[in-house]
Design a protein with these regions (language model features):
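Central antiparallel beta-sheet cores of small beta-barrel/beta-sandwich binding domains
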Residues: 30, 34-138, 148-153, 165-166, ...
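Hydrophobic, helix-forming membrane-interacting segments
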Residues: 1-31
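A short pocket-lining beta-strand/turn micro-motif at the edge of beta-sheets
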Residues: 141-145
Length: 205
């Protein structure tokens, strides 16, 4: 019994000491964890017109993908991700989010994860997770971030995606993808609606 009490006191002592160290520096620690100013913004993979693309890690072949992120007060991240393959695989709507929960002290050691979801029936939080990405690198010197794709229900995302911030072609890429996704959705409904109508008109066929 005395051994358990000693262990419990030790654990409590460590916890109290940890909290005592955390509280005086919580603002600095939260700034480090949240990376609000750095992560908030427009990110993309197309490094055309960027003369030092190699410094960003963008001198590799990647699909055109755009991401927009907003870091909330609690450090959670709300974002949007869009690409041709994502729109083709999820043609019902191209409202595709990329969100991350508020980080905790464990994220000093473990990378943050982001969940990709699609708006279905007017609900995003209850929709299935399409893909999970892990933020493995933050290069603040060159304004670049790297994600590792942990899971991907579409099977078409590359294993790794590298994004640069505020790249010259972001707006052009974003407009192209918006137009592409609108056409992808229209094509889907053009192909599906006649089949649905046929089933309604001939339920026994």
């Amino acid at each position: 019994m005395s051994g358990r009490i000693t262990t419990l006191c030790t654990v409590l002592g460590v916890a109290i000491a940890t909290v005592g160290l955390y509280l005086p520096y919580r603002n600095e620690l939260n700034d480090y964890l949240y990376q609000k100013e750095f992560l908030t913004g427009k990110w993309s993979t197309d490094a055309e017109y960027v003369i030092n693309s190699g410094d960003l890690g963008l001198d590799i072949s990647q699909p055109i993908v755009t991401v927009q992120l907003i870091v909330d007060k609690d450090g959670s991240i709300n974002g949007e991700i869009i690409s041709e393959t994502l729109c083709d695989d999820m043609p019902l709507t191209w409202n595709i989010t990329m969100n991350s929960d508020s980080p905790s002290l464990k994220n000093f050691v473990f990378a943050r994860t982001f969940e990709v979801r699609q708006l279905i029936n007017g609900a995003m939080d209850k929709s299935p997770v399409v893909a999970t990405l892990k933020l493995t690198e933050e290069d603040q010197k060159h304004n670049a971030i790297t994600f590792e794709v942990v899971s991907d229900a579409t099977g078409r995302l590359p294993k790794k995606l590298i994004f640069g911030k505020d790249l010259p072609k972001f707006d052009e890429n974003y407009k192209f993808l918006q137009d592409y996704c609108a056409k992808s959705t229209a094509k889907f409904y053009e192909e599906v609606m006649p089949k649905i109508k046929k089933l309604r008109d001939n339920p026994k066929s």
